[in-house]
Amino acid sequence: AFPASAAGDEGFTIDFETNCNAIFMKNLDTGTVVFTKNADERIEPASTTKILTYIVVSENVEDLDGTTVTLTQELKDSLEGTGSSIANIMVGETMSIYEALNCLMVPSGNDAAVILADYVGGRKNQETGNPEKLSNIDRFVQMMNDKAAELGCTGTHFANPDGLHDENHYTTARDM
C-alpha cells in the first residue's frame, strides 16, 4: 500500500523522498500521472513567470531582430526597491526584441520583462483602442492570463510579467 498521490495509473510505487513543497510528474509519452504532491496548491511562480512572458512576446512580435525597445526612466523606476534581478539595461538603451528576450531569460532580468511587456501591451492597446484604459503592462498581463488559459492552466493567475511577489500572482505545480 502506498499513498494514492504516489501511485501511477499503472500501479507502480514511487521510491524516493522529496524536499519540495509541490510536485506534478507526468509521463508525456503515455499521459500517465506518475507522482503528485500538493499539485493543485497555489505557489508563487517567481521567475518561471518569464517563460510565459517570453511566449507572449515571441507570439506577438513578428520581427524579433528588427523590432527595437528602449528602457525609459519610468519603467526603471517601477522596479525601484523591489530587489529585482536585472540585466543592467541602462535608461535610454535601445536593443532588439531578440536581445531583450535574452536579457529576460539569461540573467532573469526584470528590467527586460517590463520593457517587453510595455512594448507588446502598448501595441495591443493601440490595436484595440484600449476601451478598458489599461496600462501597457496591465494589458500585457491580461494577454499572459489569456495565454495561460489557452494552454489549459486552471490554477494560474499572473499579476506582472516578471514574477515579483503579488497576492494575485500564483500558479500550481500541475499548471507548470
Residue locations for each model-derived region?
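Active-site-adjacent loops and short helices of periplasmic peptidoglycan-processing enzymes
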Residues: A6-R174
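C-terminal segment of classical bacterial N-terminal signal peptides
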Residues: A1-S5
